Amino acid sequence: MHSTHPYIYDVIVVGAGHAGCEAAHAAARMGCRTLLLTIDLDKLAHMSCNPSIGGPAKGHLVREIDALGGLMGRVTDRTFIQIRLLNESKGPAVQAPRAQADKRLYAKVMKETLETIPNLDLRQAMIERIILPRPINRNGSDTDDAEALCPGHYAVVTHTRRIYQCRALVLTTGTFLRGRAITGDAIWGAGRAGEAPATALGEDLAALGFPLVRLKTGTPPRIDARTIDFSLTSVQHGSATPLFFGFYYRALNEAPPEPAFGGPPASAYPEPLLDAWRPQLPCYLVHTTPEFHEIVRRNLDRAPLFSGIIEGVGPRYCPSIEDKIVRFADKERHGLFLEPEGWSTHEVYVQGCNTSLPEDVQWAMLRSIPALRRVELMRAGYAIEYDALATGEIAADMSSRRAPGLFFAGQINGTTGYEEAAAQGLMAGINAARFVQGKPSVLLRRDEAYIGVLIDDLVTKEIREPYRMFTSRAEHRLLLRADNADLRLTPLAGELGLVDRERVAVVERKREEVERLLAVLRGKRLYPSAAINARLSAAGIAPLTGEMSAEEVLRRPEVRYRQLQPALDLPACEADVAEQVDIEAKYSGYLLKQQREVERLRRMESRRIPPDFDFAALRGLRNEARQTLQRFRPATIGQAARLAGINPADIALLLVALERQTRQATPVETPHPSLPHTG
């Protein structure tokens, strides 16, 4: 028999990876008594694969998480050993920070942070069963004592038979559901190397009727820095100027985050930057060789990816090294980055070399690279197969379409990447709390956030492989820059109780300051004169040849506000304000064009489809369209239009049916775009 003394919470989060930590933190901050359960509290927020956070689109997600009061950005700022701004030579839409974190310190700081959050309890336990408020399609045991559970509550059963109850349940199980690890012909049950899989929970979800698919991911070998010839590598340093993921440290009277590590770095790494604005370690670039490729080709018959041992579908945009060599046979070499896994460890991550080849092959292929002739492997690479939900199981608020109050986030939804998981976890935690509080769900549109793009893609697209975020997936990416995530999202975070009033006030002051300076620039007329041109030339700005406004001068590609400010006696401002002024001035035409397109599309998004709308009864609809709409159950006309196989004629029929339904019922008021909307 299970324990008859269950603990009762508002929200329970199962799994304490990047999704689970953000979900639990958000729910607790919003006033819900929350429990975070994980198999191993020492591995909370563990970086199972690469020791990096951010990059194009992923860095955008981290900035958005921070703007919404999440943790990932600020924990990274305390634990990174290197940070860079990627795509610095390109436009602002694709520029994004990327950091190398000390992976063990990241987990330590995240755990210490969560331990200080009111309303949040942490417990170590493996969950084996879920009891639904109203069990559906269960093929399992009849011994569940549902009568002992509070009405309307979920229950989770641990491996020690403890029962915890909650009104909203969030599953963030990562790669643990019936996970198995694979290196060559060696196969063992694992959620990741060294940790047991959640086999019973995977079987229980299947018994409850949730359709599951098998996905695959992989990780490269880790090597010993003391056995690398760094003189044969290319060194890649971090940023020479201060750069963080978190917004407003100074404005909130918070000291810039000091590194959580101290003392000298591991002795093996050459050229550490110890006296700069922040101690940093370099990364190091090497390339594969013809011998490397030949070793891989010679052993393809031993590769689980090609022998049939691996059944799960892997991420297209993060292929294994053996897959790259087969698919891109014409490429003579591939770049591999050697990334230190921490400040004081000699363990190095070989980025770009994830593999499930036999361990002896891994040794041989790495030792074919000149810088790695004497390299020693500390851990072999492996693939991991796991269960994930089939497409169409989640709604736009991250909830289950089958069971109200049940939410999913992270790799269980078919995504890959820490940042994608954290973003989903944040939204799942927010909406779990809103569910408990009887409030409407919060949905972010595609024009509001990369988080909105991510979730909309999960809801409206067939996910056949682990999903990864790219800037190219965001059609409004000039509006969704990493630099303006605070202006876009922090006011909403304030409404939800995720950040305090002071932080919202700082954002609004910044917005007002940007608008004020743009007005000053537009109103300041300049005429060619010896005095003006001399001042411009002294600032490194080409002289005037005709009358123009100061804003028009700033639109020149090479001119920056902080360069123009002293030359024209313009108001001084903080660097982040100047950055916004630069972008708003230089890209005003493009921004206006995108904003008009957003307004056009927003009218479609605002036309909501009732959750119980009967697509099967819609006359004239093609069978393919009817089946697709029934499967995905879009929440808005905009979502319906983005579904594969839905054409304009289908949308026209749907609009007519909704108009007819609206005339027959009391109209539902559409929420203001800036407020949370129902999902």
UniProtKB/Swiss-Prot annotation:
FAD binds at residues 15-20. InterPro entries: FAD/NAD-bd_sf, GIDA_C_N, MnmG, MnmG-rel, MnmG-rel_CS, MnmG_C, MnmG_C_subdom, MnmG_C_subdom_sf. GO terms for biological process: tRNA methylation; tRNA wobble uridine modification. Disulfide bonds: none annotated. The keyword Transmembrane helix does not apply. One of its GO terms (molecular function) is flavin adenine dinucleotide binding. GO terms for cellular component: cytosol. It is found in: Cytoplasm. NAD(+) binds at residues 314-328. Its cofactor is FAD. The keyword NAD applies. Keywords: Cytoplasm, FAD, Flavoprotein, NAD, tRNA processing. It comes from the Bacteria. Pfam families: GIDA, GIDA_C_1st, SAM_GIDA_C. Belongs to the MnmG family. NAD-binding protein involved in the addition of a carboxymethylaminomethyl (cmnm) group at the wobble position (U34) of certain tRNAs, forming tRNA-cmnm(5)s(2)U34. Homodimer. Heterotetramer of two MnmE and two MnmG subunits. This is tRNA uridine 5-carboxymethylaminomethyl modification enzyme MnmG. It comes from Roseiflexus sp. (strain RS-1). The lineage of its organism: Bacteria, Bacillati, Chloroflexota, Chloroflexia, Chloroflexales. The gene is mnmG.
